[in-house]
């Protein structure tokens, strides 16, 4: 984002920002107050005043199911990324059906910034993965992404998530 009155060209953030944060941010720049929106304005972050309570992890979901990139949801921190590939169409259109066993990916972004090595089964990361799974469940609940209307997802979560 570049805003000559406040944000110099080339400004980069390391803070974790979500796409839902852009609407409240742009609204704040325009002097419009938005209430009851999912995202958070990151104007303060852009001004170099990141709030102390700014998120340390983000949750996202990729609904579209294709063989090249199966449907999944994930949690990311500044250092780690944990992804659950469930590969189901659910109610989505423009998706593909293909055989795929649900699986996990885990990356240490500090040691593997290009995500070349899936470290999900590396025992040294077991405590981090366990905590991130808990955090992911909490973030899913926080944004209302609980899959309650998809019994198939509940079965997959029982089989692959909680083990």
Feature names for model-found ranges:
Residues 62-121, 156-163:
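C-terminal, low-complexity/hydrophilic appendages and adjacent surface loops
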């Amino acid at each position: 984002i570049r805003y000559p009155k406040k944000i110099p060209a080339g400004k980069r953030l390391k803070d974790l920002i979500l796409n839902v944060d852009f609407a409240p941010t742009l609204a704040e720049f325009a002097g419009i107050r938005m209430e009851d929106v999912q995202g958070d304005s990151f104007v303060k972050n852009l001004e170099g005043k990141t709030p102390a309570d700014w998120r340390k992890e983000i949750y996202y979901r990729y609904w579209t199911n294709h063989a090249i990139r199966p449907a999944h949801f994930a949690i990311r921190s500044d250092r780690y990324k944990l992804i659950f590939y469930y590969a189901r169409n659910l109610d989505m259109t423009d998706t593909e059906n293909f055989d795929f066993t649900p699986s996990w990916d885990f990356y240490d972004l500090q040691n593997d910034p290009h995500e070349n090595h899936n470290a999900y089964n590396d025992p040294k990361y077991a405590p981090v993965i366990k905590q991130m799974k808990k955090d992911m469940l909490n973030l899913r609940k926080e944004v209302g992404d609980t899959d309650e209307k998809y019994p198939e997802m509940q079965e997959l979560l029982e089989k692959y998530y909680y083990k």
